[in-house]
Amino acid sequence: MQTIHIGVLSASDRASKGIYEDLSGKAIQEVLSEYLLNPLEFYYEIVADERDLIEKSLIKMCDEYQCDLVVTTGGTGPALRDITPEATEKVCQKMLPGFGELMRMTSLKYVPTAILSRQSAGIRNKSLIINLPGKPKSIRECLEAVFPAIPYCVDLILGNYMQVNEKNIQAFRPKQ
């Protein structure tokens, strides 16, 4: 079984300064560990809400570490320093707006302010990048919604084959 390389990038001014513990990055690792049977290698970073820092980390995770999947958390709202979607779009060759649409639709079931989210997803080379919200509960809800499409997307961009733990989540792959 192939090892899946996963980048986890937390964008947070306060967590990057050690003001509080980053629970969101840990939540991403926990959920993906439940969903995948493959051996997983996580590359984890916390950076401030600075566009150039986010872009550099995304590029490093995609190009140097050759992550199959890069998941960001934080910086997707309308606040002045929330710039994760812009950094993601800058480094991607293709954007996948359906991921953000589904995550917003899912989150709207729980909170009306989900309409303020600017989550997105895109492809850089052979890496799928997905922007998630900043709260662990919302991370789980959004990953549960979009994960069924992730393994097939990674297949299409020639990433490593993801073995899904079907006891915890179902993925969709069209019959070949």
Swiss-Prot record:
SUPFAM superfamilies listed in its UniProt record: Molybdenum cofactor biosynthesis proteins
PROSITE patterns to which the protein is assigned, alphabetical: MOCF_BIOSYNTHESIS_1
SMART domains named among the record's database cross-references: MoCF_biosynth
Any one biological process term the GO annotation gives: molybdopterin cofactor biosynthetic process
Pathway it works in: Cofactor biosynthesis; molybdopterin biosynthesis
Superkingdom of origin organism: Bacteria
Catalytic activity as recorded in UniProt: molybdopterin + ATP + H(+) = adenylyl-molybdopterin + diphosphate
InterPro entries cross-referenced by the UniProt entry: MoaB/Mog-like_dom_sf, MoaB/Mog_dom, MoCF_biosynth_CS, MPT_Adenylyltrnsfr/MoaC-Rel
GO cellular component, one term: cytosol
Enzyme type, top EC level: transferase
Keywords in alphabetical order: ATP-binding, Molybdenum cofactor biosynthesis, Nucleotide-binding, Transferase
UniProt-listed Enzyme Commission number(s): 2.7.7.75
UniProt entry tagged with the keyword Transcription regulation: no
Pfam families: MoCF_biosynth (PF00994)
GO molecular function: ATP binding; molybdopterin adenylyltransferase activity
Family: Belongs to the MoaB/Mog family.
Cited function: Catalyzes the adenylation of molybdopterin as part of the biosynthesis of the molybdenum-cofactor.
Name of protein: Molybdopterin adenylyltransferase
